[in-house]
Protein backbone atom coordinates (compact mmCIF):
# COMPACT_ATOMS: atom_id res chain seq x y z
CA UNK A 1 0.00 0.00 0.00
CA UNK A 2 2.70 2.50 0.97
CA UNK A 3 5.54 0.50 -0.62
CA UNK A 4 7.71 0.68 2.50
CA UNK A 5 10.70 -1.61 2.30
CA UNK A 6 12.73 -3.22 5.08
CA UNK A 7 15.30 -0.42 5.23
CA UNK A 8 12.64 2.30 5.56
CA UNK A 9 10.88 0.30 8.28
CA UNK A 10 14.15 -0.15 10.19
CA UNK A 11 14.87 3.58 9.97
CA UNK A 12 11.37 4.43 11.29
CA UNK A 13 11.86 1.95 14.17
CA UNK A 14 15.23 3.47 15.16
CA UNK A 15 13.84 7.03 15.07
CA UNK A 16 10.83 5.92 17.14
CA UNK A 17 13.09 4.20 19.66
CA UNK A 18 15.23 7.33 20.06
CA UNK A 19 12.26 9.74 20.28
CA UNK A 20 9.85 7.65 22.38
CA UNK A 21 12.20 5.47 24.36
CA UNK A 22 12.04 1.71 24.98
CA UNK A 23 9.18 1.97 27.55
CA UNK A 24 6.62 3.84 25.40
CA UNK A 25 7.51 2.40 21.98
CA UNK A 26 5.51 -0.89 22.35
CA UNK A 27 2.40 1.00 23.54
CA UNK A 28 2.64 3.52 20.71
CA UNK A 29 3.23 0.74 18.18
CA UNK A 30 0.17 -1.16 19.47
CA UNK A 31 -2.01 1.97 19.32
CA UNK A 32 -0.71 2.84 15.88
CA UNK A 33 -1.44 -0.71 14.68
CA UNK A 34 -4.97 -0.49 16.09
CA UNK A 35 -5.69 2.77 14.24
CA UNK A 36 -4.17 1.49 11.01
CA UNK A 37 -6.40 -1.60 11.28
CA UNK A 38 -9.48 0.56 11.79
CA UNK A 39 -8.53 2.73 8.82
CA UNK A 40 -8.10 -0.35 6.61
CA UNK A 41 -11.44 -1.72 7.81
CA UNK A 42 -13.17 1.56 7.04
CA UNK A 43 -11.59 1.75 3.59
CA UNK A 44 -12.56 -1.86 2.82
CA UNK A 45 -16.13 -1.17 3.96
CA UNK A 46 -16.27 1.96 1.80
CA UNK A 47 -14.90 0.01 -1.16
CA UNK A 48 -17.50 -2.74 -0.79
CA UNK A 49 -20.31 -0.17 -0.47
CA UNK A 50 -19.17 1.56 -3.65
CA UNK A 51 -19.01 -1.76 -5.51
CA UNK A 52 -22.48 -2.70 -4.24
CA UNK A 53 -23.87 0.69 -5.28
CA UNK A 54 -22.30 0.33 -8.73
CA UNK A 55 -23.85 -3.11 -9.15
CA UNK A 56 -27.24 -1.83 -7.98
CA UNK A 57 -27.09 1.10 -10.38
CA UNK A 58 -26.09 -1.22 -13.24
CA UNK A 59 -28.98 -3.57 -12.46
CA UNK A 60 -31.40 -0.62 -12.33
CA UNK A 61 -30.22 0.56 -15.75
CA UNK A 62 -30.60 -2.95 -17.19
CA UNK A 63 -34.12 -3.25 -15.75
CA UNK A 64 -35.16 0.12 -17.20
CA UNK A 65 -33.74 -0.89 -20.59
CA UNK A 66 -35.69 -4.16 -20.53
CA UNK A 67 -38.87 -2.33 -19.53
CA UNK A 68 -38.44 0.10 -22.44
CA UNK A 69 -37.91 -2.81 -24.83
CA UNK A 70 -41.10 -4.44 -23.53
CA UNK A 71 -43.02 -1.19 -23.91
CA UNK A 72 -43.57 -0.68 -20.20
CA UNK A 73 -43.03 2.56 -18.38
CA UNK A 74 -43.32 3.58 -14.75
CA UNK A 75 -46.73 5.20 -15.23
CA UNK A 76 -48.34 2.09 -16.71
CA UNK A 77 -46.89 -0.08 -13.93
CA UNK A 78 -48.08 2.37 -11.28
CA UNK A 79 -51.59 2.42 -12.83
CA UNK A 80 -51.71 -1.38 -12.85
CA UNK A 81 -50.56 -1.49 -9.24
CA UNK A 82 -53.14 1.11 -8.18
CA UNK A 83 -55.91 -0.83 -9.92
CA UNK A 84 -55.25 -3.88 -7.76
CA UNK A 85 -57.18 -4.09 -4.51
CA UNK A 86 -55.31 -4.35 -1.27
CA UNK A 87 -56.39 -6.94 1.34
CA UNK A 88 -57.81 -4.11 3.48
CA UNK A 89 -59.95 -2.87 0.59
CA UNK A 90 -61.22 -6.39 -0.05
CA UNK A 91 -62.12 -6.82 3.63
CA UNK A 92 -63.95 -3.46 3.66
CA UNK A 93 -65.88 -4.31 0.51
CA UNK A 94 -67.35 -7.49 2.03
CA UNK A 95 -70.89 -7.04 3.31
CA UNK A 96 -72.02 -8.48 6.65
CA UNK A 97 -74.31 -10.93 4.87
CA UNK A 98 -71.29 -12.57 3.24
CA UNK A 99 -70.45 -15.56 5.38
CA UNK A 100 -67.23 -17.47 5.39
CA UNK A 101 -67.48 -20.87 3.76
CA UNK A 102 -66.99 -22.76 7.02
CA UNK A 103 -69.83 -20.86 8.73
CA UNK A 104 -72.12 -21.45 5.78
CA UNK A 105 -71.39 -25.18 5.80
CA UNK A 106 -71.93 -25.51 9.55
CA UNK A 107 -75.22 -23.58 9.68
CA UNK A 108 -76.92 -24.59 6.45
CA UNK A 109 -77.45 -27.99 4.92
CA UNK A 110 -76.92 -28.27 1.23
CA UNK A 111 -79.93 -29.12 -0.96
CA UNK A 112 -78.48 -32.53 -1.75
CA UNK A 113 -78.30 -33.31 2.00
CA UNK A 114 -81.96 -32.31 2.42
CA UNK A 115 -83.00 -34.45 -0.56
CA UNK A 116 -81.16 -37.50 0.75
CA UNK A 117 -82.64 -36.97 4.23
CA UNK A 118 -86.17 -36.73 2.75
CA UNK A 119 -85.56 -39.86 0.67
CA UNK A 120 -84.33 -41.79 3.74
CA UNK A 121 -87.39 -40.71 5.73
CA UNK A 122 -89.68 -41.75 2.85
CA UNK A 123 -87.94 -45.16 2.59
CA UNK A 124 -88.30 -45.74 6.33
CA UNK A 125 -91.99 -44.77 6.23
CA UNK A 126 -92.66 -47.13 3.32
CA UNK A 127 -90.94 -50.00 5.17
CA UNK A 128 -93.10 -49.44 8.22
CA UNK A 129 -96.25 -49.68 6.14
CA UNK A 130 -95.16 -52.95 4.58
Swiss-Prot record:
Q: Which GO terms describe its molecular function?
A: protein transmembrane transporter activity
Topology relative to the membrane: Single-pass membrane protein
GO BP annotations listed: protein transport by the Tat complex
Entry's transmembrane regions = 1-21
**Does Nuclease show up as a keyword for this record?**
no
Q: Where in the cell is it found?
A: Cell inner membrane
Q: Where is the composition biased (Basic and acidic residues)?
A: 57-67, 111-130
Any Pfam family = TatA_B_E
Q: Does the keyword Cell membrane apply?
A: yes
Which region ranges are annotated with the description Disordered? 57-130
Q: Which UniProt keywords apply?
A: Cell inner membrane, Cell membrane, Membrane, Protein transport, Translocation, Transmembrane, Transmembrane helix, Transport
Q: Give an example GO cellular component term for this record.
A: TAT protein transport complex
Self-association state and partner proteins as the record states: The Tat system comprises two distinct complexes: a TatABC complex, containing multiple copies of TatA, TatB and TatC subunits, and a separate TatA complex, containing only TatA subunits. Substrates initially bind to the TatABC complex, which probably triggers association of the separate TatA complex to form the active translocon.
Give the family from UniProt. Belongs to the TatB family.
Function in brief: Part of the twin-arginine translocation (Tat) system that transports large folded proteins containing a characteristic twin-arginine motif in their signal peptide across membranes. Together with TatC, TatB is part of a receptor directly interacting with Tat signal peptides. TatB may form an oligomeric binding site that transiently accommodates folded Tat precursor proteins before their translocation.
**PANTHER family attached here?**
SEC-INDEPENDENT PROTEIN TRANSLOCASE PROTEIN TATA, CHLOROPLASTIC (PTHR33162:SF1)
The protein's matches in NCBIfam families, at most eight in alphabetical order, are given as:
tatB
**Any idea what this protein is called?**
Sec-independent protein translocase protein TatB
Q: Which organism is it from?
A: Alcanivorax borkumensis (strain ATCC 700651 / DSM 11573 / NCIMB 13689 / SK2)
Amino acid sequence: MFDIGFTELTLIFIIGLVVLGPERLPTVARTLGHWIGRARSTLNHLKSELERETITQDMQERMEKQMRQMGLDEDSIREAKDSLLSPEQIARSRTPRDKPLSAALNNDESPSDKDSADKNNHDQDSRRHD
